[in-house]
């Protein structure tokens, strides 16, 4: 399986994490780690999410970008890492 890290900027809304996790799960990714820091100056959340899957990370990136409360999604490590079982 491939391991990826996403950096996400989102609006600080009550349902944003639920939507983020739901889309991630629907697309066949497993969340292996997540950190979130609120930015009170501009009402945004800075989220770093690690995921693993055999699916294309680009597809997940585009799906998350479509969410209303998501401002930006970038893949932190373009080259995937192989995770041993």
Across the structure, where does each feature detected by a protein language model lie?
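A conserved regulatory-domain signal marking ACT and ACT-like small-molecule sensing domains
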Residues: 2-85
């Amino acid at each position: 399986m491939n391991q990826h890290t996403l950096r996400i900027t989102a609006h600080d809304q009550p349902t944003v994490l639920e939507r983020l996790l739901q889309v991630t799960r629907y697309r066949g990714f497993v969340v292996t780690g997540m950190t979130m820091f609120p930015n009170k100056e501009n009402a945004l959340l800075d989220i770093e999410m690690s995921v693993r899957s055999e699916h294309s990370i680009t597809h997940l990136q585009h799906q998350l970008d479509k969410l209303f409360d998501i401002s930006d999604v970038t893949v932190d490590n373009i080259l995937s890492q192989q995770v041993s079982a």
